[in-house]
């Protein structure tokens, strides 16, 4: 409801008169009452709402993904005319968007599945927008979407036509998976600095402030520096009294499930999903901590040196995560015939969204230089960073393993990097085993 309200206010602020409808009359009245003088026109029946719109109608749905979206579409259909456009701005599973696009197209309606990133504030002030559906329908809503989207530092709006049917929601799903990876990598860096150096919250804030002025400059690093020094009403550091159980809404899981369907090694992002799952086993972890032995963390030595190693490991881990995510976008584009433009996708993540970061420009540059590059790790900039930073990543992972500090995504980063650069892997033995017990056959070198 908040996302829908904020998007309506955003659209209204660009000079449009906006018809609004909610199943709850109270919520509709509340929005109007809270925003006097705004060009928000409330309607209390679907029929009146639909009939208030100019044709071709442009209807933005912001409802909970799943059955609720189908129910909302079904309630609209009796009052729609051919050529009307429904835009689904929810966190919808891309296969549902493909289905709805097909079904509505058959009835003469247009359907645009649209990823919207940036949370409640982004919805109001300018989100990153990822629309997918019929190109001609997108052209009819592009003027509105362009006006309400976030604007990058170079003045470009953070919205492009992504591709047919479910492409927009697929890109949003991978964006969310990358977000999971970024957050877990940052959490592991925090754990290493706290466990390896006993840094205070003030020192952590200072460290992250410095990091945010360099290669790691991003929204997530920026908010993390603030989180470290935020205190509760009792004067305690808030982060230290928050229970260590990370929730999830399932979009990271969808990204991992899709990687399995496509045969893509999305190991880092998948580990970040699993890290949230194991965090939720709090009671089991507390019990296991009293039974299972392991090393106690020893101090990591020179402070400045270790902080720099963790910074480098974090940046290279981030690069590996994005390399995996964009590799999956390529596989999906081939599978679903979307013809995705990876450099432009990286561009629209530069403002408005949760993963906005300075380094996204490097991804755009890499694809501008070589549109067909198989993996971002092979692009000159990222290859040079990997050459320079991999020792730090190895040292940090080795320290963590020796000292019993779990670093699932840092570990996944180095494992993927080494696997990807290996001309020969021990999979020949696995294939021999498969042939031995199941006559699966094999290829000779």
UniProtKB/Swiss-Prot annotation:
UniProt keyword Oxidoreductase, yes or no: yes
Keywords: Gluconate utilization, NADP, Oxidoreductase, Pentose shunt
Enzyme Commission number(s) of this protein: 1.1.1.44
GO MF terms, alphabetically ordered: NADP binding; phosphogluconate dehydrogenase (decarboxylating) activity
Residues that hold NADP(+) according to the record: 1-4, 22-24, 63-65, 91
UniProt binding sites for substrate: 91, 117-119, 175-176, 180, 249, 276, 434, 440
One example of a Gene Ontology biological process annotation: pentose-phosphate shunt
Keyword Oxidoreductase tagged: yes
Reactions catalysed, as given in the entry: 6-phospho-D-gluconate + NADP(+) = D-ribulose 5-phosphate + CO2 + NADPH
Active site as annotated: 172 (proton acceptor), 179 (proton donor)
Pathway the protein takes part in: Carbohydrate degradation; pentose phosphate pathway; D-ribulose 5-phosphate from D-glucose 6-phosphate (oxidative stage): step 3/3
Superkingdom assignment: Bacteria
Protein's job: Catalyzes the oxidative decarboxylation of 6-phosphogluconate to ribulose 5-phosphate and CO(2), with concomitant reduction of NADP to NADPH.
Subunit structure: Homodimer.
Family: Belongs to the 6-phosphogluconate dehydrogenase family.
UniProt protein name: 6-phosphogluconate dehydrogenase, decarboxylating
Gene this chain is encoded by: gnd
């Amino acid at each position: 409801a908040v996302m829908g309200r904020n998007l309506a206010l955003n659209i209204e602020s660009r000079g449009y008169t906006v018809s609004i409808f909610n199943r709850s009359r109270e919520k509709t009245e509340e929005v109007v009452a809270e925003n006097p003088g705004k060009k928000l026109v409330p309607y209390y029946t679907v029929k009146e709402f639909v009939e208030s719109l100019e044709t071709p109608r442009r209807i933005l749905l912001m409802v909970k993904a799943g059955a609720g979206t189908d129910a909302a579409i079904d309630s609209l259909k009796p009052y729609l005319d051919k050529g009307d456009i429904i835009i689904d701005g929810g966190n919808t599973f891309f296969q549902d968007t493909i289905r709805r696009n097909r079904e509505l197209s058959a009835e003469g309606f247009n359907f645009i599945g649209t990823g919207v990133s940036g949370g409640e504030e982004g919805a109001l002030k300018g989100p990153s927008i990822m629309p997918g559906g019929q190109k001609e329908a997108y052209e009819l809503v592009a003027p509105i979407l362009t006006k309400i989207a976030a604007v990058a530092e170079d003045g470009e709006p953070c919205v492009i036509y992504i591709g047919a049917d479910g492409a927009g929601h697929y890109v949003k799903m991978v964006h969310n998976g990358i977000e999971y990876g970024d957050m877990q990598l940052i959490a592991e860096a925090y754990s290493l600095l706290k466990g390896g150096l006993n840094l205070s919250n003030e020192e952590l804030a200072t460290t992250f402030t410095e990091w945010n002025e360099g290669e790691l400059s991003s929204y997530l690093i920026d908010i993390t520096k603030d989180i470290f020094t935020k205190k509760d009403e009792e004067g305690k550091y808030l982060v230290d009294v928050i229970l260590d159980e990370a929730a999830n809404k399932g979009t990271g899981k969808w990204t991992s499930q899709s990687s399995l369907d496509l045969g893509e090694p999305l190991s880092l992002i998948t580990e970040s999903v699993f890290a949230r799952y194991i965090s939720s086993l709090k009671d089991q972890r507390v019990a296991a901590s009293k039974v299972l032995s392991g090393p106690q963390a020893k101090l990591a030595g020179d402070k400045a040196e270790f902080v720099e190693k963790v910074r480098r490991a974090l940046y290279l881990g981030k690069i590996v995560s994005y390399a995996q995510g964009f590799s999956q976008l390529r596989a999906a584009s081939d599978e679903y015939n979307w013809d995705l433009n990876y450099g432009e996708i990286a561009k629209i993540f530069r403002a408005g969204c949760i993963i906005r970061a300075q380094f996204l420009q490097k991804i755009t540059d890499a694809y501008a230089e070589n549109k067909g590059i198989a993996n971002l790790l092979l692009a000159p900039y990222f290859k040079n960073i990997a050459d320079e930073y991999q020792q730090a990543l190895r040292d940090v992972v080795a320290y963590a393993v020796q000292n019993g500090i779990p670093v699932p995504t840092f570990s996944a980063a180095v494992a993927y990097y080494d696997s990807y650069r290996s001309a020969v892997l021990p999979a020949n033995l696995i294939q021999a085993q498969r042939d031995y017990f199941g006559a699966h056959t094999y290829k000779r070198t």
